[in-house]
């Protein structure tokens, strides 16, 4: 990705945090521009991950803060849970109602409030998240699971809406 060709300083240094923050801003700029339900819009994955494009994006990381050309979204609430047992079963779970009490709908006899991720749709026909029947909206729910050599190491994750990719990166930098 964007950081793959950059020699990272130790994780808690200002230099490392700057590189992480700037790379996440670039990644979110791409996310808000391209991520959509692939059943409704072609996503140029090969081009987005091409070394030539990554190099162009990487070149935008300088000493000064990069200002994304898309609007960033407000913060909301989430809960994350990771668990494992002695038999090797593992779960990485994230639940987010997104805003307030989510959709305001509760499953009868359970008290479980349903989320309102449909809020992330756009009415702009040019948006990758333009509202269409059966389409899934872009969201920030990222339960992580770490693998090595095809074998599970364990679940991981963080809360924090658009901080999640950066938080996951910070966790992985410390493993």
Which residues does each PLM region occupy?
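Alpha-helix C-capping/helix-to-loop hinge sites
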Residues: 6, 174-175
């Amino acid at each position: 990705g964007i950081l793959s060709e950059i020699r990272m300083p130790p994780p808690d240094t200002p230099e490392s945090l700057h590189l992480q923050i700037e790379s996440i801003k670039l990644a979110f700029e791409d996310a808000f521009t391209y991520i959509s339900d692939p059943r409704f819009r072609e996503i140029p994955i090969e081009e987005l991950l091409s070394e030539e494009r990554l190099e162009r994006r990487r070149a935008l990381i300088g000493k000064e803060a990069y200002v994304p050309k898309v609007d960033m979204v407000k913060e909301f609430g989430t809960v994350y849970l990771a668990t494992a047992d002695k038999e090797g079963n593992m779960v990485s779970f994230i639940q987010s109602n997104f805003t307030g009490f989510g959709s305001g709908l509760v499953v009868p006899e359970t008290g479980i409030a349903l989320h309102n991720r449909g809020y992330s749709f756009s009415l702009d026909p040019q948006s990758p998240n333009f509202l269409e029947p059966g389409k899934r909206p872009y969201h920030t729910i990222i339960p992580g699971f770490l693998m090595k050599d095809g074998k599970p190491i364990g679940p991981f994750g963080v809360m924090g809406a658009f901080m999640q990719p950066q938080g996951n990166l910070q966790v992985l930098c410390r493993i």
